[in-house]
Amino acid sequence: MKKYIVFLWVCLLSAGMQAVNPSGTLPIVYMTTNSGQAITDKENYVPGTVYIDPLSTGYAALGSSSAPLTAQLKGRGNWTWSGFDKKPYKIKFDAKQKVLGMPKNKHWVLIAGADDWLGYLKNPVGFMISKALGLRWTPGIVPVELVLNGNYQGLYFLTEHVRVDKNRVNIQEQEDLCTNADSITGGWMVEIDNYWSENNIEFNENNGQHVMVSLDVPEVLSNVQRDYIVHQIEALNNAIYGNSSATLEQILDIEEAAKFYLVQEIMEDCESYHGSCKLYKDRDSLGMVDKWKFGPVWDFGNAYDRHAERWIYDGPTWPQYWIGQLATWPVFQKAVKEQWWIYYHQYKDTIKQQAIDFANQLTEAAKLDAQVWEGTSNFRNNSNMADRRDDFIDRYNWRINWLYKQWGEGIQPEEKGEGVETNPTNIESRKILRNGQLYIMYKGQMYNVQGRRVEN
């Protein structure tokens, strides 16, 4: 009898530990570390290989089981790394690769989505809205299934890593420890952050809130670079809290800021100006000062969590730096309402359908993901994708309707000057520099570089 009980226990244990296999409905990323070494931290890369089998999804394969690509692998993320057993990863290929239809680069991330309880739709739809509104660059994101060292890990999202590159944030790259006065004016990418690091720039916002800004690039600063970036952040803060619209518009790209903000309001992301809030600046040239731009968007992990009929800066769960004050500026309000007009009339229904279609392709992989990770730390159950999808769509519709009550249909954007191009070649046009700003003269009229007519 004892032998029978032991045999039965072993059989049940073996059945419970039976490996889960990929659904076969999404591309499969096979990631293998040398000697099966575990990926245990975010700081140290582990050497390994990667190949991607697209199955019948229409994407091109990347490497193969017999010829995988060499890469360096490590963990990534903050709360998503420390708060969940399902871990996100960073991939650095030894050579630039075009991956699942996305432009060539060495650097990619595998987002785990373990913090997303709304059908894994928060980041993908946030990115969709950003692309629809035309922010200068939005990361590409493709759902995949991950096999790590031969073990199925569930549903992941292969995503372009945010970095300065001609195919990503396309600005002049600035070297570490640079001291050249012209070069240090651009190639900056910074982040309003909620995690401390020794290179952070810290200051008190004019409303008394303590703000930390981390530096993505450059990473190692000369004294000249640090003095410049500290002055720039102070100038941006002073302009936001100042009383001169002209000063604000000289340092901040208002249209890009409006687009970035509208994405956050539609997604009701109350942590959007608290962490992972990126800004970048290109190099000044031709006597023209390049403006700071909000973006690219990243991390919608808290989207729709509050579910309140309030602005994202009104009594938020976390401090929302700068945006509450920026939202008081008439020039910003007008730009936001113009972007809202575009979104409301052209994209609100399209994005909803794209979200539904995106969710539907995740159905089988989401079921298997739940089998792998149910019972682990902070598990979010998305096994019933139809319910999770519908909950997300209900919240999206609710937010669109609430914003309509605030803004109506918005303000139809002004038409740009007919026949005017940012870089015209017509012999009747010419560029002029006035008070440090670049303008275009066309048929006796003066336009700014966005193509809008200004007074001569």
Identify the residue ranges that each predicted region occupies.
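Internal "kinase-insert"/substrate-recognition segments embedded within catalytic cores
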Residues: K92-K98, N105-A114, G134-P139, N151-L262
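Conserved NTP-binding catalytic cores of kinases and kinase-like/nucleotidyltransferase enzymes
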Residues: V20-V125
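Middle-to-C-terminal accessory/interaction subdomains
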Residues: L26-P27, Q37-I39, T80, F84, ...
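C-terminal outer-membrane/trafficking sorting elements
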Residues: E415-N456
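Positively charged n-region of N-terminal signal peptides that target proteins for export
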Residues: M1-Y4
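Coil residues (strongly favoring Ser/Thr
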Residues: P54-S56, S183, S285, T350
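Bacterial N-terminal signal peptides
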Residues: V6-A15
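A conserved helix-loop-beta module that forms one wall/lid of the active-site cleft
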Residues: D116-N149
